[in-house]
Regions:
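Short, hydrophobic beta-strand segments
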Residues: 95, 151-159, 192-199
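His/Asp/Glu-rich mid-to-C-terminal helical/loop segments that flank catalytic regions of hydrolases
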Residues: 110-128, 163-175, 211, 215-218, ...
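Acidic-enriched catalytic cores of C-N bond-cleaving enzymes acting on peptides and small amides
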Residues: 83-84, 105-144, 163-189
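Acidic/histidine-rich catalytic neighborhood of metal-dependent amide-processing enzymes
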Residues: 2-86, 132, 136-142, 153-160, ...
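Active-site-adjacent mobile loop/cap segments within catalytic or ligand-binding domains
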Residues: 140-170, 174, 239-246
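Active-site-adjacent substrate-binding region
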Residues: 114-131, 138-140, 187, 197-245
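Glycine/charged-rich beta-loop-alpha catalytic/anionic-binding loops adjacent to active sites
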Residues: 1-12, 96-99, 220, 252-256
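Phosphate/diphosphate-binding glycine-rich loops and adjacent basic-rich segments that engage nucleotide
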Residues: 70-105, 110-114
Length: 281
């Protein structure tokens, strides 16, 4: 109650992820330009395209950027900040079957679509995005296409703990091996690609940047909440590139769907938070 919201008409995305973050940063810059007596340390600002497809830091030059540490403004609630995120892998599953006329296929046909369905079932319903929360990891089958002869499936694997991630990879390998064995051939191949890692491995070595966020939030009247991200940010990759980079909120909610909205009041608090942080820079 009493908040001002930005929404769409419900038929499209709002794009607050991450237009809201850009607006907060530029509002901070505007304030600095209009208030020349505002004292602050040296600051560096960058905007990265293609974050949503995992390529936001592909050409980012950390040395040229010139900062000792940074914060992405790409989260949700304005009183939340994050220095943990998922470890992320992509799994490309290729299934090569044997196609025969269905009327004369007994003992001969190996249906790649059927193997794909069986493979996915073996991963378990309790390890899917719609069944997990908090730090629970998941397999997400987000693309599948094919026919009897060839079927391709693309998964994303997510977990905050790398040991759990390795177990998930092993489970997929065991499922493929089992189906190959019971069908007396080699039909299923899996290629795994590391996408990003949990930034906490880096942030734990620089705890002062976490303390600065907590103190800045308290100073502007927020009660800080450290919340692990069930996703990733450019900050995860930047952290492993030598630029420790926790994530701050934007006041946006329900990202990536038609019910997305953003709180103007929260965005204003986001500007205050950045100004408080750079005073301590």
């Amino acid at each position: 109650m009493g908040d001002d919201l930005i929404t769409t008409d419900g038929t499209t995305l709002l794009g607050a992820d991450d237009k809201a973050g850009v607006a907060i940063i530029m509002s901070m810059v505007e304030y600095i330009c209009q208030n020349r007596d505002f004292k602050h340390g040296d600051i560096c600002i960058a905007f990265t395209p293609d974050e949503e497809v995992g390529r936001g830091t592909e050409n980012f030059d950390v040395k040229r950027f010139g900062a000792d540490y940074a914060y992405t403004v790409d989260g949700g609630r304005i009183d939340e900040f994050s220095f943990e995120n998922f470890n992320a892998y992509k799994a490309d599953v290729t299934i090569t079957g044997k196609s025969y006329h269905p009327g004369d296929s007994k003992g001969k046909m190996v249906n790649a679509l059927t193997l794909g369905r069986q493979f996915d079932t073996m991963l378990g319903d309790n390890k899917r995005p719609e069944a997990t929360e908090h730090k629970e990891g998941f397999y997400h089958l987000h693309h599948m296409e094919g026919d009897v002869s060839t079927t391709k499936m693309t998964y994303i694997l997510r977990d905050h703990d790398m040991d759990n991630m390795h177990d998930m990879i092993h489970t997929m390998q065991l499922a493929a091996s089992y189906l190959n064995q019971v069908n007396h051939g080699h039909y299923i191949d899996i290629d795994f690609t590391l996408q990003y890692k949990n930034m906490i491995e880096v942030i734990n070595k620089t705890p002062d940047i976490v303390y600065k966020v907590k103190q800045a939030m308290i100073n502007i009247g927020l009660e800080p909440i450290a919340s692990p991200i069930r996703g990733g940010t450019d900050g995860a990759n930047l952290s492993f590139m030598g630029l420790p980079c926790p994530n701050l909120g934007t006041g946006g909610y329900n990202y990536h769907g038609p019910y997305e909205f953003c709180s103007i009041n929260s965005m204003k608090k986001g500007v205050k938070l950045l100004l408080e942080l750079i005073k301590e820079a």
